[in-house]
């Protein structure tokens, strides 16, 4: 009974979960890949099996019936695997332990909207689920000969208590425990995890649950090798001593995250009947505006990571793929103790605020901005503008931003961090025909892909138009005002068969892997104002983690040593 319930069953769960996650077809090589990950990484497999065994013990004692315990674990595992398939197919990344923080009304509503992109892959997921259910039924039916019960009351109390204590220890993510598990079970270093190019690589190489746990371990901050506080302070002191004098005057500052703003005209195979960014192309010729390529951390989603980098100057390249600063870094202990543009502008007497059509619970947004110290936050339920297509229009958002700027004056400045949503995925059947200004002149793609390309292009056209409308409006302000607009990431444009003609475009698939990676993580950034900006730096590109610091250090403001160092 003990062998079946506490050894065989947990190992089956780990095995079947990895198989479920890896299957892209029927049978064949995938089956052996699962065995390969088990035998080449046996200790992680054994470690996760022990954790599931402890959970089985706890539930068995709770129900006093191992059959019920196994049913609960089978059902929970199936739900996890099913949702993982959905998330991976829609967003391109697997489920993580931190996704518990994603389960809130605003994020669930956004994912519900995205289900219009669900396609034929869901059939494969359903078939896998049915096979899983059949195997689960067989296990439960055979369990009548191996049902484990604890008739002794002391055992029913002591066993789950001890099991729970042991189970909790690996999930405290204490630094010493992390290092022990990494070194002795996974036999990996922090740098090896950081070298992983994609989060699903961990899941594939280590196994499903094994990779999920390793991903969580890798997200923990650790001091770099040979770290020295003295050396770090010397570097900061050098940056401060050599910091440049400001060349821009004190002004209102608007930093706008423009959803998926990049230049789709760089891609081959499709042509449009007009220039998609006529105003920004015009700005490029002006000597008082900055138009540059922006290197961003995410691809296809997780906009808040670009927002995080711009606001904090922290590069997420020091953390493994999949880390989300808003959901994993901020806590009550950091209130008043964090570095951000919000804090910098607060220290310079600005009113600071965040404005977006998204919801306040999305990625814990309202909580995070309270930790950052924003004076005011405005979310979608407070905005009165119109949607265009599925989401709140960029034109309406620009009007909302200008309404906030109208009340400013010299000595009464505002810093506004804003985020748009109109050009968020899904792109299929997003607009009514009457919503389009952009038409496709020629295309090599099928109807579905062409429809998505056109929807995305319309979003870029509208973002360019809305930015220019705001630019014209701020010319009427007496208060100096700077507007920074940046794209958060390239679009995630998946077809219903789970392929992406956008991602497979030759622009992203040259013979140079470095160029391919750079292009996948390149968007646009624009800086303009209602006064003449010194643009002598001639920026060709900038990383998102430097963008906020760059603007801050250009202005006539009191800047912390930290942000002087970031801009150095």
Set out the residue ranges of the language-model regions.
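Solvent-exposed, charged interface segments at domain starts and junctions
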Residues: 1-9, 23, 108, 114-115, ...
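Membrane-interface segments at or immediately adjacent to transmembrane helices
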Residues: 172-255
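Alpha-helix initiation and N-capping motif
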Residues: 100, 104, 205-206, 211, ...
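Solvent-exposed soluble domains appended to multi-pass membrane proteins
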Residues: 237-248, 255-258, 263-568
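A diffuse structural propensity rather than consistent per-protein peaks
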Residues: 86-99, 119, 224-229, 340, ...
